[in-house]
Amino acid sequence: MKRIILILAVLCAYAAAYAQGIGTAKDLQAFIQAYNNGESVMQWCDADTTICLSADIDMAKVKNLPQINSFKGKFDGKGFRLRNWKATRGLFLDIAATGLVQNLVIDSSCSLKSVGKGDEHHAGFIADNNNGVIRDCVNYGNVTHSCSYALAQSWVGGLVGYNKMIIYNCANYGEVTSDTSGELKETVLIAVGGICGGTPGKVPVVATVSRCVNEGKVSAVSSLMSLYIGGVAGYPGRATMKFCTNKGEVVADIRESEDGQTTGVARVGGIAGQTKGDMARCENFGAITSMGACSANIGGIVGMPHELLVVADCLNYGTVKSTGDLPSQTGGIVGNMGRPVHVHGCINYGDVIFEGVSSRNRSTAGGIVGNVYVPKAATAGAYVRSCINYGNISAGAGGNKYDSNNRNAVHAAGVVAYMEGREDLRSCVIDCANYGTINSKGGRTGSICGSAVSTTTGGAAPSDWAKALDAPAADGNLVGTVLDSSGKPWEGVMVTDGLQYVKTDANGRFAMNSDLNTSNFVYLSVPADASFLVRNGIPQTYKRIPRHAVAAEAHFILDRQNVAENYTVMMIADPQVRTFGVDGSMETWHDTVAPDVEAFRASCSEPVYCINLGDLVYNQMPAWDDYMDGAAKINGPTFNVIGNHDYDQGNMFETEQGSVYYESYVGPTHYSFDLGNFHYMVFNDIMYDRQSPTGRYYYGLDERTLAWVKADLANIPKDKVIITCSHHNPFKTPNTSPHGSHNAYSLNYKEYLSLFSQYKAVYAWNGHNHENFYYNYKGKNTPHGAPNIQCISVARCTGALRLNREIAAQGEPQGYMVMEVRGDSLSWYYKGVGTGKETQMRAYSPEKTSDATVKVNIWNWSEGWSTPEWYENGVKVADMSFTPGIDPAYLEIFNTITNKTTKKYCTPSDKAILFSVTPTSGVREGEVRVTDLFGNTFVEKVSW
């Protein structure tokens, strides 16, 4: 609400500066006529050809305003209002893919009364159909829809009826009501939402409803076969919904049709009735109710998610209640799901109540999810993880005739009332907790699950939340302590909210004034004399700040240890996993790479740490659960970096909207810690705030991350060695020959370069490029970078993209970089899966090459290495020539691929680091010798 008011205030402040634009109802009518006739509309444009309002528009005398057809330009309301408009359809009939409508306000004096005539019907105040972008618009008017005999679908919303693209930062305060009761065609559906009705069909990947708020009551009375109703969207289809809030009451009432048949099924949710797209960081405060002659799938967030998708980091505070005459599935977050939905990190505070009729079939009431079932065609199971319920659960008998051991009994539980898996699928309810009461008049109950069939259960909910306080302390609104495991205060520990740092005092206490609306975490920069407490491999150095808190406190415990002078860090890049059964990436991560990492870790005598350098998943947010499980196989602290593919690829406007998944599963996107004598800094340098669907992500540090870097380094002596870990290298990338391109155009490059150039040495590690690369700025004649900076890029650990076989596109084996720290010095080498340090190259005999030469692929060769030497009979014959090209072994694998999509993504690279030599005539064997930049000599023999 505050966000919307601020937007409107700013817009109104500068609106008077525009002399041109639409300033009266007559202007609006004239513009619509001219636009629809294909005539010039420049007289209503501002300097950049945007159609704009220049004043509030009084529509009291306007009758039957024509709609704006297929709008392809930009329309800016400048915060002005349409007043006294008695509408029957939206202002825009259709906003085209290139269209943008923004900053338009519909006043409370307006009303939309839309009457369906039986055919397909779309209605919303701003647009009946949206294929473009609608942003920063607000509706205060009431929307009323009715249809006495529906022959086709109806889509009704406060702002948009049928949405196939982007609705961003919009709000609805008007009531949205629909009445489709009566003698109606049974197969017809209706979708009703406070912001939009939605769409069932295909949508572009960028389709999103985000940062939207509904505060109006949304209600529907229907006799149709399917009713989809949500506080924000009825049925958004595959559009993602992120950072949306509902504060309005949502009521679904399915009634018998006039012929007495009971046909309806309601999907009812605080945010959406049904969805096939991800939902992240959404909240519901409104009461959600389903009643009448219907079955209902009803949830505080979504009634029925119906695809492989994620519902993550969502909160429900509203009461969820079902009183229908047929069986219903009722949940604090999700009502019913029969697809491989991943519900993660959600919390329910609202009461969940089933008081309906359920004589012959199962009905449920669950604090997080009501019912989970497995269809026969299922290839994957559902996950419910790291969720907490505080709401009270209540279930009536419902006239149910089954005893508690029957799957068709009424089920009530604190987390999932009825959880069905299958022996051949992975289904789980893990790391969840219930603090609410369970009251049921019959059937089966449980604190976590009422029934869990072929499902993995167990674990404990993570204790990673700070405690909300009623009021700030005298010295700050974010306070806490850091103690050691014996209870002794730990002085001097750096504590951050992701923007600023403070240090703990002699009592181990810290305090700061933080903007809790923008700070999601409070966390530590762990000192070198502390060991990491881990949960499933992830260091527990952070606490999540409760949303809406005015103040919070967080308490941390660390174990003291001697500073480890010698240790090893495994740098792992780009697992890029998709869910099991898609492209083999998850199988490779779980069965090949992670076990090899763990085996290597176990073989080391000194402490070992793991840093995963981003692109942990690959454009598929449901893969996060299984990625994390694979990483947990590494029995030691594992630090993670966010990469571009860790965002959902439809993300726009704000980087935070895409990083929400990483934050939900992993934690902060930038943080630091000390190991031995070195200071490690992990940060996000992928900017995903593109402003148009055709834009793309870019690189650099945003203002918040840059401020954090400054604050962090302000506490670090200049004689320290800094290790940076990011997905894209902040200084150098291997995009051009011979040494790659500099990143001088990255966001805030000069500022962060200036900061890092002041330190003794900086080693900048990254993934992203799917190849090994090294660059040392020392001695280079370039205006970029600094002589204290060295850059190291690591190849994709799971092999070539989409192929995920043992050899990657440049011929390097699946593997990772091993960094060995010995006091103040460090070195590194590439470790292939199943091999050791000694294996740094692969040689090919003349029989395997196209030019009858001996070739060797040295996949980690770089400046500082020696030129490879060719030996015959123990005697050096020649230096080998650098002849980059396609690796023969990888080409052999590639030629066996038949899938066209796979071949498209894993084409052999012509940049394999190959060296060649022509052997002496008659010689049938020899060896290659090469020395790396740390003085280690490697030998590879070859014979033919």
Describe the role of every protein-language-model region.
Residues 20-468:
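Surface-exposed repetitive/solenoidal architectures
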Residues 779-862, 866-871, 914-920, 925-944:
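Binuclear metal-dependent phosphoesterase catalytic core
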Residues 477, 529-624:
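N-terminal active-site segment of His-dependent metallophosphoesterases
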Residues 475-479, 484-499:
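Short, ordered, surface-exposed loop/turn motifs in non-cytosolic proteins
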Residues 496-515, 887:
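Short, acidic Ser/Thr/Gly-rich low-complexity loop/linker segments typical of extracellular
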Residues 466-477:
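Beta-strand-rich domain onsets/edges
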Residues 528-536, 540-548, 621-716, 742-763, ...:
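Extended active-site neighborhood of metal-dependent phosphoesterases/phosphodiesterases
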Residues 509, 887-917:
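Aromatic sugar-binding surface patches on proteins
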